[in-house]
Amino acid sequence: MSELDDLLNEMLAESEAALNGQSTINLNNNNSNNNNNNNNNGNSATKISFQEQMPNGNGNSSTTTTTAAQQSATEKRKSRLSQHPSNLNEGGFDYLDTLLNDMSDESIRNSIKTDNSRIKSLRLTSTFDLESTLKDLEETFMKDSSIQNKRKPSSYLSKNLSPPSNPSNIISNNNASTLPLPPPPSQQDDVVIIAKLPPPVSISLPPPPTTEELPLPPPSTEELQLPPPPPTTTTADEQILTDSVKNGNPILKRVSSERAIILTKEAIDAADLLDEMIESFGGIPEPNGNNSLPKEIKTTSIPTPIVTPSTTTSTNTTTAATVNKLNASKSPNGTLTTRPAAKLGAPVDIQVSSPKAPTPIPTLSSPSPSQSAAPQPAAPQPTPTSQPQPPTTTVSTPVSPTFKDSDQLLDDMISHFKESNSNLLTSSSNLDPSAPKVVYTSQQFYPLSVEEQSLQSKVKVQLTPDEQVIQKILGNNDLDDDITNKNNDNNSNGNNNNKELIDEQNQIEQQQSDKSWYIKAQPSDIIGSGNNGTTQRAGIHKDKRIVMKQWNFITSQATPMLFNEIEQLVAIKHPNILALAGASFDNQTFTTFTEYITGSNLDIVIKNLDEKNELQLILRLSEEIASAMSFLHSFNIVHRSLHPKNILLNSDLKIYIKDYGFTSLKDETLKKKFMSFQLKNQLLHTQYLAPELFNVLSGSKGGYDTKVDVFSFGVLLWEMFARDIKLSDLKSNTVNGYTHYLRPPLPNCPFTIEKLIKLCLSTDPSVRPTFTTILKILRQPLHTIQRFNKPTQQQQQQQQQDQQQQQPEQQLTSSTSSTSTQDSLVSQEQVEEKIKNEMNNLLNPNKRFNESLDPEKRVKIEKIANVVKDLISQPTLLNLHRASQTIDQLCKNVENIEYLLEADFVPLIFQLMDQPYDEIQLSCLKQFSTLIEHNEEIMNLFRNLLGINILMETLNSQKENILFITLRLLSQLSNGADREENREQILIKGGIPLLINLLSHQNELIRLQILWCLTLLLESNSVQVEFVKLGGVNQLLDMMVHSINSGFDLRVASALARVISLKSVQDQINLGHYRERVVKKYLSLLGDTQFEALRMLGLEAIACLVSNKDSQFILTASNIVDLLLSYLDPNSTSMAPQMTALKIILVLSVNPIHIPYLKSSNIIEPLQYLKSSPHPSIQKAVEKILMLVSSK
């Protein structure tokens, strides 16, 4: 119950703070108890306490009224706290209800308004107004340590941002009194700042003075005292001047938080530039007595309060002027910032009380200098109620010659700010509301720039087949005659057509030169060719090797549509898609460019598969293909030529799909070749084309959609399991151009995958599943995919007979049940319905209900799972933190693991792991570690959902905490005799070379964890062979001879003990330059009497190395017999060490050179006792040693 007690104490502290009208925020330790804001808890964190008090009639101070949102949050807290057993009510405290309430939308909104320690949105206004942007930056706290170090918290966080309880209430000068000064901060480690702020003086700023000047008031009552200039170093709470002097306080138009650019690089760069602009303002020099001539500004008749560097006070006057009851504070440049905002998105009212007339700051919405020179009437400022304007007085300010330079520098910086941020969205209205939402189905997240997001939001233009061309080809006239007539027509108008083509080509080249994706073609060696064109090397582009593909049958009419499609294809990114680098239209030739991948295509890899790991590799490759295709289909992009030649694999066997899109060009090529007798024989990869494609080419009605790619994927999946057998080599029957192949059953294919292939290869596109469904099936655990039994031999023979007798369209009518024989008259529709039902059951294998689980708790956790899904669907940093913290709370309780498994929390953690935030990834890795430690089923699910792929990526992390928890996870997956499958997967995914490279890490704790992980992995024979082949033994030997720590010796020796029995490793040690030092190191381990584990490791290693003659001399010189006597005790029950020690002595006794040493040692007597050992093997070894020693 410790976690519940901590959560309860935190909630009690927040409730008490809310009832007292104050909120304490701890910036660096959000989990500590904040019951007393003035106590020193020994931490170095800085606490900022907001407190606002106003004098009442009796001279006592009272707290301000809380907002409606605070009251609502307080009541919700009180209602939950009332269920705690410490109260009078019964029922107890339920932290699941607390999680649900805290994760509600209303709770999120209230926490943003009332608790500044929450992560708030970093926003830029629609016109980039500097004042409102500064306001947003001041109110922003970053929980992320990296961002928090970059952004400095402002002193304006010490003000209460809540609105006054009654905005229309005014305070006259007769009953106003001077507020007491705040007490100095206590001299403690935790600096507590309490701001008790006086009411400000409202000052209106007119245009340059044109009215009559009034004399200055007496210095004794209305004299203005200026603060000294601030120091040259930049402070964290510098202010900015007003946006427009002539137009009063502008009404700022803001971007909604849903559309705000949160924590992106552009926002941080813009914020940094704002800091530079603010710092350029500098300080206001102190006036030199009466020597400086004042400059005129217009103020109200209320005297300006005297401002000093240390305190802020206001004087009372008898003038019947009214001011609003607002909070104010002094900034280093002498400005008073009034904040009547009730929420984060309200405008900021900045009013200047310094003697310096502020320079108008031009913004994107302000008029040009020429327009501002003309006199314009000041726009009235909107107020809640109509109030009479107070009389004004002209006050002079001193002028400094440095002001002009500062103003000029500010104007230059603003211009630079506009130019450098011109690519940002300035208004939410620029976003297309009809644009589809980008859905990432991959296991990797790509943060996109605003420009890339705009390109991805464009919907692909739907292209339909050219029916007119097809009708002409399929008409009554002969095909050759049609071509001849067309050529004759072209010749008759050749001059005009050539001129039009030249003009059109020049226009296209002029248009594409302005595109960012334009690349000048530089063809080189030809790599290959296919149906649609020829592929060649194209040199270097942006430090990467690229290849170019020249497309066949390109028409000028398709150019405008291709421009749109190129922009969309260039913008999309996916880890398994070979991105389009650019394109060009040169000399009536269309060329596309992609990155050059060193590797092989899918055909070559499948033919060289290892039968032992065949199923796991096929499922992984299929999953990556399905993930990439699902991503393309989410943009309505059809590949239309998915076959092994267009699927590349690099040296790490990672999938890259190329030649996607451009369906109009592919259709045109296929039509010309299909309808031409001369080109028809040049058609390649026809077995991967769906039947509806041939129907379109043959003149039938209809078209095709994304389901043609599903058909191609079904053929690919079948050929992966068939390996050497190609579908085109089988017996076939051609109908309307489409070839029906008689596919034999595959004995190595799981029955589940076989049914999936049948659905994908259905002649009816509506029966084929989507790639989203396919992806979910392939991501199921391996035991789930293999749980269905394959048909018996008798059923397989029956299926083969049915396939030979029936037409291929009726192949799907065969039985899909693994039980008894089925009715042969079952229709195709019924069988397909049964397949669909079984697939639906397969999609949700974890949706089982354990009767032993609490139903009420199950419902609550399912509700929490739905809320977490909603938060992840809107991946702001705030939402991701809340989702991660919620899962952390649930994982801490081991009793919740079964509920989390049933509610599908593991895929949610995988989705969080895709986010590019180190703290989120670290939290997810810890959650996986907790779940895998206590549940074997979750470990298998983690492995089958490609969790090991994620660990291979995090092994390359520069963050030591992420690297450490990754190594811990790998150790958990490898620890145990039944974890052989996990070790094999780590080997296949390339984990061994990564771990060997990390052995040189500078952190010793990480090196120890790597050694332990390698020790567990080296239990596998295949891992041992790979480790030795990659040179890992040399690194272990080097670490061993230089080790001076017993703990490090234990880890290194444990890892070497797994491979030292191999003959290749023994030869490597005996022939290496570390031989003598290694043998002496093992001797020192054998003589270590404090650690028995080290002695055993040394004994085993010496037994492996004693066969080398040079090593034998080192052993005899070190008096090895004395170290072995303790193992020759006849009363010892440990037979293994005794046999190992006898082996060492026996090898030494075989060499006559060592007989004198053995005779001189005290070994004869212990051997005589061992002759009576009950173990026959020990008796034979002792007799052999005594015979050798006594005979020589």
Curated annotation (Swiss-Prot):
It comes from the Eukaryota. PROSITE patterns: PROTEIN_KINASE_ATP (PS00107), PROTEIN_KINASE_DOM (PS50011). Residues 201-232, 377-391 have a biased composition (Pro residues). Residues 44-60, 325-338 have a biased composition (Polar residues). Keywords: ATP-binding, Nucleotide-binding. GO terms for cellular component: cytoplasm. ATP binds at residues 527-535, 549. Residues 26-43, 61-73, 154-175, 301-324, 362-376, 392-402, 485-498, 791-828 have a biased composition (Low complexity). GO terms for molecular function: ATP binding; protein kinase activity. Coiled coil: none annotated. Belongs to the protein kinase superfamily. TKL Ser/Thr protein kinase family. This is Probable inactive serine/threonine-protein kinase DDB_G0280131. It comes from Dictyostelium discoideum (Social amoeba).
